[in-house]
Amino acid sequence: MPKLKVTRGARNQERHAPLAEQILAGDAVRAGTREKRRRHGVEEEEEYVGPRLSRRILQQARQQQEELETEHATGDRPAKPRERATRLGPGVPQDGSDEEDEEWPTLEKAAKMTVVNHQAEVVVDPEDERAIEMFMNKNPPVRRTLADIIMEKLTEKQTEVETVMSEVSGFPMPQLDPRVLEVYRGVREVLCKYRSGILPKAFKIIPALSNWEQILYVTEPEAWTAAAMYQATRIFASNLKERMAQRFYNLVLLPRVRDDIAEYKRLNFHLYMALKKALFKPGAWFKGILIPLCESGTCTLREAIIVGSIISKCSIPVLHSSAAMLKIAEMEYSGASSIFLRLLLDKKYALPYRVLDALVFHFLAFRTEKRQLPVLWHQCLLTLAQRYKADLATEQKEALLELLRLQPHPQLSPEIRRELQSAVPRDVEDVVVTME
């Protein structure tokens, strides 16, 4: 058999295998070529969008996002140059970030979008403010904070122990372990300077402790930064039961919000976001923030506008809203009550008849009122007539028309009267359906 001639181009190619090996290889699946083709296809897909094209796509998307943010943030105002966001504290990257850190960039983006709404001072009509002050409580009760509650509990406990135990067999009141105090004093130092980043693990476990109020008192909530208050609200709203969350809202969050509004004439963005996060438990939010704010009798128009904006922006279950409207309608009137009732009525819930009856009686109680009612009161009555005129009974409709004669408003009363007269009462509608 002659010698096989090898060409230059085929010097690296493999020779034909023996016939027996070719037959055996023919029975097997040839996966090598397919794998090579698949790998080649992946390379083609990866090379389809090059780095230069990717940069162009990201640049175009960024420009479109900036245009949208400028339109939504400034409205008709001329567009201002986009400022670079800066953190209030040292932005040192840390390992082991958890869910709190993942949400923080989203919070910063939201701050950019709403900087016009929250950084500007809330404009209040002086006439409305004077009208609301006429209905404020002249002798308001003393506001209680968490520190006051804890000190009262400690005093009561000490008195009880001293009364029950004799001097010989008496034991001192159990105090916190010194090591626990040392840990949470360190947590207090962190929260007093907190801007962003990871919270101490010792702080995150406070909701699981039986004496969480006493531990929280050690950290001095009144000295926390606004960012720390936001993170604390997230933790307590998620992990506490509704009754405990209500106490946190009422004793810690609400006093801080009111103090901030009174001092700066607007609400810090982080505290505003804390109020929104607190709505995770709507029952606790109404019982711990809105109802105490109305019951205090000292809620200013600025406070009502800021807190009311959260009601208009957030979705609230109808049962909690109905219970809150019933409670506000039955309590002593204050100017802020009209704002909150109007915002809740604007949500157009299918309210129970008991709530509607309470709202009607709430307005009818002003038939003998000698003081001039604020415009907010007439606006709330107009909203009730617009949204629920078909759900009122004939007697209620006639009583409200009589109320308009006793408490008139030159612009709003004709509109309210037109709404009431154009609707068919619910009892008349029921009679027609029965006859058919």
UniProtKB/Swiss-Prot annotation:
Residue ranges of the region described as Disordered: 1-105
Pfam family, one: Bystin
Keywords: Cytoplasm, Nucleus, Phosphoprotein, Ribosome biogenesis
GO annotation terms (biological process): blastocyst formation; cellular response to forskolin; cellular response to growth factor stimulus; cellular response to interleukin-1; cellular response to lipopolysaccharide; in utero embryonic development; maturation of SSU-rRNA from tricistronic rRNA transcript (SSU-rRNA, 5.8S rRNA, LSU-rRNA); rRNA processing
Comp. bias intervals (Basic and acidic residues): 70-86
Chain positions found as Phosphoserine: S54, S97, S166, S413
Modified residues (Phosphothreonine): T155
One GO cellular component term: cytoplasm
Molecular functions (GO terms): snoRNA binding
Record-linked InterPro entries: Bystin
UniProt feature, compositional bias: Acidic residues: 96-105
Record keyword Ribosomal protein present: no
Subcellular compartments: Cytoplasm; Nucleus, Nucleolus
Location, primary (coarse class): cytoplasm
Function field: Required for processing of 20S pre-rRNA precursor and biogenesis of 40S ribosomal subunits.
Subunit structure: Binds trophinin, tastin and cytokeratins.
Family to which the UniProt record says this protein belongs: Belongs to the bystin family.
Protein name: Bystin
Lineage of the species this protein comes from: Eukaryota, Metazoa, Chordata, Craniata, Vertebrata
Gene: Bysl
